[in-house]
Design a protein with these regions (language model features):
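Short beta-strand edge segments in extracellular beta-sheet folds
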Residues: 9, 104-109
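Extracellular carbohydrate recognition
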Residues: 1-11
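Short, surface-exposed loop/turn motifs with a glycine/proline- and acidic-biased composition
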Residues: 67-98, 102
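A generic beta-sheet turn/junction motif
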Residues: 34-36, 96-98, 109
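Glycine-centered coil/turn sites that cap beta-strands in beta-rich domains
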Residues: 17-31, 35-55, 65, 77-80
């Protein structure tokens, strides 16, 4: 027997039968936190929905609009660049239908 006569066979299963559809809405804590100048924000949309994520300063003034559009159900992650802002505490708020959640983050320069 020679090595040229060797045959290998394998069955590979690569069928995905269902898509992942989250059932809840969720806004995760940004990371890193504190940050300089960028941070990531992860959020989950439970059903197809118009989604808004905005950033506010400590006085409640809107300083950035990160998302303002219809989103299909799924898990998302975005990057926030705070390089144009001063050091301090900021809040980011997710609104999707009747769901609202706010988290705090800190920019340190």
């Amino acid at each position: 027997m020679y090595i040229d006569d060797l045959q290998l066979s394998m069955d590979i299963v690569s069928d995905v039968t269902e898509d992942y559809h989250p059932i809840n809405f969720q806004l995760d804590q940004n990371y890193p936190n504190p940050f300089n100048p960028g941070t990531k924000i992860k959020f989950t949309v439970g059903t197809d929905q118009f989604v808004s994520i905005k950033v506010y300063d400590i006085l409640g003034n809107e300083v950035a609009s990160l998302v303002n559009e219809e989103k299909p159900a799924g898990v998302y992650e975005l990057e926030f660049d705070g390089s144009m802002l001063s050091s301090g505490v900021y809040f980011y708020k997710l609104i999707a239908g009747n769901f609202t959640q706010t988290k705090k983050m800190q920019l340190i320069k």
